[in-house]
Regions:
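Cytoplasmic juxtamembrane regions at transmembrane-helix boundaries
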Residues: 72-91, 161-183
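Selective detector of the "anchor" transmembrane alpha-helix that sits immediately C-terminal
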Residues: 11, 15, 65-69, 145-166
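Interfacial loop at the N-terminal end of multi-pass membrane proteins
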Residues: 2-84, 109-133, 173-176
Length: 183
């Protein structure tokens, strides 16, 4: 069971980190290349990027909750208490992902619609569009900073998960839960 838990934990961390690398360096920037802008001009390329980004956040939520479940299962079966650093890495990345997907992304969506109000058949003054463009740039920078923190944190988490660590001391998983006392 412990080898399965180890394999599961490494798989979750690798998928989580790998998806972040793929989206950050390959998929995300592809929406804003000259080739893409010829196929799908602004603001529609940004709208398509938003759709993909929403799925990216769902993947982050799933991986985050699976990583937390793995930490709990590893503690229950091996008796090893997860280190604070590992718990903070998983909790921090999951928290940033929830913040990005549930608060920041809708904010950017709204600002993009005001910025390109004419394309979306909305009414907005030139000042509102200009303010939305400025705010969008600032919040997009915040989003990129958060993504950088997520990237580095997941890299550290993956490095921690692939290390075998020390065996549990003075704790037998069977005795921990009193399962050796069969009546």
């Amino acid at each position: 069971m412990l080898s399965f838990l180890r394999f599961f934990g490494v798989t979750v961390a690798a998928v989580w980190f790998g998806s972040t690398v793929f989206f950050t360096f390959f998929a995300g920037p592809a929406f804003f290349t000259d080739e893409m802008k010829k196929l799908v001009p602004p603001p529609y390329n940004g709208a398509i990027a938003e759709l993909v980004l929403s799925r990216y956040f769902i993947l982050h939520y799933i991986c985050g909750f699976l990583a937390l479940a793995h930490l709990g299962a590893d503690w229950m079966y091996s008796g090893k208490i997860p280190t604070r650093v590992t718990v903070w890495l998983v909790g921090g990345v999951l928290g940033l992902s929830l913040l990005g997907g549930l608060w920041l992304q809708p904010k950017l969506h709204q600002l993009q619609h005001v910025k390109y109000a004419d394309h979306y058949r909305l009414t907005a003054t030139a000042q509102q569009r200009e303010a939305a463009a400025k705010d969008f740039g600032m919040w997009h920078g915040v989003s990129q900073t958060m993504n950088g923190l997520v990237f580095l944190s997941l890299w550290l988490y993956l490095a921690r998960v692939i290390q075998p660590g020390d065996p549990a001391r003075f704790v037998s998983p069977i005795n921990k839960f009193g399962l050796d006392r069969r009546a």
